A protein has these predicted regions:
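Catalytic core of non-heme Fe(II) oxygenases with the double-stranded beta-helix
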Residues: 9-111, 115-117, 121-142
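Short N-terminal edge-element motif at the start of the domain
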Residues: 1-8
Length: 142
């Protein structure tokens, strides 16, 4: 469940992310999200394309986990909070709206983030909050 207020997020949590899954050669790591809430404004999933080349992108991701949060935000000129739009480092390319019992499946290496544009609606109550089930699979590339 997503429950944190934007000001509680770490630097890494304020960026989109990809699921670093190990997969045997010739297979594709897949990730999934099953939306278990019936309140679409709690948000679906955004997908992003990195704008940076590989080396600076890697450094951004490393720094988001190693630097003190405020130093990271100041250095990269980013704000603490849920990533809901494009920035200088990532372009938002797709949003999949939430719908009760909808499952999305996507390549695990695609950058993504929850569409948390109404964080004031988040709650720790699984009956009314943004409850999801996340799964990870390996698919054949044949």
């Amino acid at each position: 469940m997503v429950t944190l207020a934007p000001e509680q997020l770490t630097a890494a949590q304020s960026l989109c992310h990809r699921d670093r899954l190990q997969a045997p050669p010739g297979t594709l790591p897949l990730a999934s999200v099953l939306y278990l809430f019936d309140d679409p404004p709690l948000g679906g999933t955004h997908f992003f394309r990195p704008i940076l080349e590989k080396a600076p992108l890697t450094q951004l991701l490393i720094d988001s986990n190693r630097m003190e949060a405020e130093a990271f935000f100041q250095h990269y000129r980013l704000s603490r909070g849920y990533m809901t739009d494009s920035n200088a480092y990532f372009e938002k390319v797709l949003t999949v709206p939430a719908r009760y019992n909808r499952m999305i499946v996507y390549p695990g290496m695609k950058f993504h983030s929850g569409d948390i544009s109404r964080p004031e609606a988040l709650t720790e109550n699984p009956l009314t909050g943004r409850l999801t089930f996340n799964g990870f699979f390996t698919g054949s590339m044949a």
